[in-house]
């Protein structure tokens, strides 16, 4: 059964949670550019999380599984770092974007809420921290940031690649861990990273596609000075600048151990994403 709820309005939340034992909170606005007013992202992220937890507590929900992000774990976000369940992003560091602030502040609010709640019928919290999400789409909607970028890549509309690397997350891995997190007793009160352990460059991913016959894919890498120049004309490129040259290794050992998780292979994620887009575009 579907119902429509607003992250900034109380109406309908309690009714939606009636007779439920668990809540998955996966909604939070994302844009690849820096908005003029950072509260466009921060307010719905934090207030939406507050609303979910408040009504979950009132409805005697047993556990909330919250989708956060690895961007809430990046320290000062200006140098290489090893991230784990104990690392947090410093939102006061230089060049921290509104999106990064929104995810970090929303997750911190959630942990504070659970820590300070009335201990009668305590609400349990599990947090999942994915990276950039790829993998096959079940809706056929290519408007999201990851799928839109991927579509441009395989159709030849991305002539040059950013000189950066990412820890990719497969949407199927994320879905699996969310479902397992609902009832796994060992998961309560913990954060779980769901990404590749090591970063992979855009060139590496493009080469996988090229080798599979995607002839329009470019493997040329844009120099950083060129991207900085182009950022004057593109909000999307401007949003990428803080992450150029920034890499991290992710400790996913706790996720593997707790959920008996076998991550989907990078090559499979890359190719299955492309096949999914092929279907939508009828390529």
Over which residues does each language-model region extend?
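NAD(P)H-binding glycine-rich loop region in Rossmannoid oxidoreductase-like domains
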Residues: 1-47
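Active-site "gating" loop of Rossmann-like NAD(P)-dependent oxidoreductase/epimerase domains
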Residues: 29, 69-96, 138, 155
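A conserved pocket-lining segment of Rossmann-fold NAD(P)-dependent short-chain dehydrogenase/reductase
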Residues: 34, 90-95, 133, 139-140, ...
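Active-site Tyr-X1-5-Lys
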Residues: 93-125
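Glycine/proline-rich active-site loop of Rossmann-fold NAD(P)-dependent oxidoreductases
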Residues: 119-121, 135-148, 181-192
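Glycine-rich Rossmann NAD(P)(H)-binding loop
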Residues: 135, 161-164, 192-199, 210-211, ...
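Mid/C-terminal beta-alpha module of Rossmann-like enzyme folds, strongest
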Residues: 177-238, 266-283
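Conserved C-terminal active-site "lid" loop/helix of NAD(P)H-dependent oxidoreductases
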Residues: 229-262
